[in-house]
Amino acid sequence: MVQQESRLRVADNTGAKEVLTIRVLGGTKRRYASVGDKIVVSIKDTAPNGSVKKGSVSTAVVVRTKKEVRRADGSYIRFDDNACVLLNAAGEMRGTRVFGPVARELREKQFMKIVSLAPEVL
């Protein structure tokens, strides 16, 4: 469960390490984002030779949350951290690799590129 001002780890190789959530996309009164939801983020911490700059604004999709996500079969899935993957203006991945596991809910929300590049889909 990610909301405004939440800080997330970046799970791709764009060079960003940490981002701050500016807005949860999907309506004016939308407060929380879960796995598969799009958010607007500001890059707060970067690697020295990354493709993104500190302070730049980007869109991202949440791939892991500490708050559990309930599935249709009654099971729950939760992760050890909150993480996202940066997207370009067209809604495609900016990076070429994904680090760490991602949730199966991304497949249902049509983020096939992220699912195919992830080392593990839970």
Curated annotation (Swiss-Prot):
- Name the PROSITE patterns for this protein: RIBOSOMAL_L14 (PS00049)
UniProt xrefs under SMART domains: Ribosomal_L14
The entry lists its GO molecular-function terms as: large ribosomal subunit rRNA binding; structural constituent of ribosome
Q: Which GO terms describe its biological process?
A: translation
Q: Name one GO cellular component term.
A: cytosolic large ribosomal subunit
Decide whether keyword Repeat is in the record: no
Q: Which residues form the signal peptide?
A: none
Which InterPro entries would you find in this protein's record?
Ribosomal_uL14, Ribosomal_uL14_bac-type, Ribosomal_uL14_CS, Ribosomal_uL14_sf
This protein's UniProt keywords: Ribonucleoprotein, Ribosomal protein, RNA-binding, rRNA-binding
What family does the Swiss-Prot or TrEMBL record give for this protein?
Belongs to the universal ribosomal protein uL14 family.
What is this protein's function per UniProt?
A: Binds to 23S rRNA. Forms part of two intersubunit bridges in the 70S ribosome.
Assembly behavior: Part of the 50S ribosomal subunit. Forms a cluster with proteins L3 and L19. In the 70S ribosome, L14 and L19 interact and together make contacts with the 16S rRNA in bridges B5 and B8.
Q: What is this protein called?
A: Large ribosomal subunit protein uL14
- Which species does the entry assign this protein to? Flavobacterium psychrophilum (strain ATCC 49511 / DSM 21280 / CIP 103535 / JIP02/86)
Lineage summary = Bacteria, Pseudomonadati, Bacteroidota, Flavobacteriia, Flavobacteriales
What gene is it encoded by?
rplN
